């Protein structure tokens, strides 16, 4: 619930007037990094109960990011005739999400070394 509320606040605070779904893209990329970093570093370093780790990872980060919004916004871009933007959005979301997850894991490894 808190993740979804934060997603909404970021969307209306920073990206309300944009035709391109910058809010969802930014949030999904940040969430990809955050979930990878949490699971590969924080949850190993800080002793949390499995229930609390799941609540933070799946609950907060899962509700912060959203695949359904990505899907709906992509279809809307196609329906509005913005085919190129729709394709760019999907590609950047997918490749960017994978890249940010990779960076999250990489940062956690570097932090663990030091």
From Swiss-Prot:
Domain of life assignment: Bacteria
Annotated residues for binding of Na(+): 62, 65
Pfam families: CRCB (PF02537)
Catalyzed chemical reaction(s): fluoride(in) = fluoride(out)
Keywords, sorted A to Z: Cell membrane, Ion channel, Ion transport, Membrane, Metal-binding, Sodium, Transmembrane, Transmembrane helix, Transport
Bilayer topology term: Multi-pass membrane protein
Entry's transmembrane regions: 23-43, 52-72, 84-104
Cited NCBIfam families: crcB
HAMAP family: FluC
Family: Belongs to the fluoride channel Fluc/FEX (TC 1.A.43) family.
Name of the protein in question: Fluoride-specific ion channel FluC 1
Organism name: Desulfitobacterium hafniense (strain Y51)
Upper lineage: Bacteria, Bacillati, Bacillota, Clostridia, Eubacteriales
């Amino acid at each position: 619930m808190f993740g979804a509320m934060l997603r909404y606040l970021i969307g209306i605070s920073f990206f309300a007037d944009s035709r391109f779904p910058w809010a969802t893209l930014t949030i999904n990329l940040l969430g990809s990094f955050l979930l990878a970093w949490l699971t590969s570093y924080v949850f190993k370093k800080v002793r949390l109960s499995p229930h609390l780790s799941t609540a933070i990872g799946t609950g907060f980060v899962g509700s912060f990011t959203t695949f359904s919004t990505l899907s709906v916004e992509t279809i809307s871009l196609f329906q509005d005739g913005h085919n190129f933007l729709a394709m760019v959005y999907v590609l950047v979301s997918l490749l960017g999400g994978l890249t940010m997850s990779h960076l999250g894991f990489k940062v956690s490894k570097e932090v663990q070394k030091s």
